[in-house]
Design a protein with these regions (language model features):
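Short edge beta-strand/loop segments characteristic of extracellular beta-sandwich folds
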Residues: 102-106, 113-122
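Edge beta-strands of extracellular beta-sandwich domains
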Residues: 60, 200-204
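Conserved beta-sheet core of the metallophosphoesterase superfamily
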Residues: 1-94, 98, 136-138, 157, ...
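Short, aromatic- and glycine-rich surface loops/edge beta-strands on solvent-exposed regions
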Residues: 128, 187-198
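Extracellular Ig-like/FN3 beta-sandwich strand-entry sites
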Residues: 110-112, 125, 185-189
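Extended low-complexity, serine/threonine- and proline-enriched intrinsically disordered segments
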Residues: 124-155
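Cleavable N-terminal export/targeting peptides
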Residues: 133-140, 182, 195, 202
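Aromatic sugar-binding surface patches on proteins
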Residues: 147-182
């Protein structure tokens, strides 16, 4: 027996049924068009298809097609530094500065040719495949990570505040539904395929 429960507020991690408010609307307010939760999940809701005892579900991101189930990042082009928050007071407490530094430490400038994949509705029964342009299958590692888009769209903007006195709310959290692969070189194209337990196939 499986019980599915919906919650209409912000959601993160695990299998999403709904995450309408994302970061309680903060990300879209600070960066128009970027409505995502603290783990990078787009604001959205679950679609349930029930026929007799047969049940299928899919997370639907608001304003996106059903096929939008993950986001990938070329980490050669993702990095954060103190230069991104010039308005942060120089005398801010160590605890507040360290809260921001977790993003700087997670994403320093590098050329390691790594790609981070955020599959926000990941389930252990799903499968992931990453193949490069030479048809080489690349191994992946499941990692805890911060979503770079949420950092840029919300956390950086909350910390870049001359009136900052404490750690802002709803900043980017570290979550488990991330995967990392390493390409042979910086210019290699990748085909990322995610297959759900119901056989739905998503490509990028």
């Amino acid at each position: 027996q499986c019980v599915h429960q919906g919650d209409g507020h912000r959601g993160h991690d695990g299998t999403h049924e709904c995450s309408v408010c994302a970061s309680w609307w903060w990300s879209g307010n600070l960066t128009p068009g970027i409505h995502i939760g603290t783990d990078g999940t787009p604001g959205g809701y679950g679609i349930w298809d029930v026929t007799g005892t047969d049940f299928q579900c899919l997370y639907k991101s608001t304003g996106w097609p059903e096929e939008y189930q993950f986001r990938s990042y070329d980490l050669n082009n993702v990095h954060f530094s103190m230069a991104d928050v010039p308005l942060m007071p120089s005398d801010i407490s160590a605890s507040v500065k360290n809260a921001y530094m977790q993003y700087v430490n997670a994403y320093p400038q590098n050329n390691d040719n790594e790609v981070l994949i955020n599959i926000w509705n990941w389930n252990s029964d799903w499968t992931l495949s990453v193949v490069d342009e030479n048809r080489k299958t690349l191994p992946y590692t499941e990692v805890w990570a911060y979503d770079p888009l949420h950092i840029a769209a919300l956390s950086v903007k909350r910390f870049n505040n001359a009136g900052l006195k404490s750690t802002p709310s709803f900043i980017t959290d570290k979550f488990t539904h991330f995967f990392k692969v390493k390409a042979d070189d910086a210019d290699t194209d990748l085909v990322i395929t995610v297959t759900t337990i119901y056989g739905f196939l998503f490509l990028n």
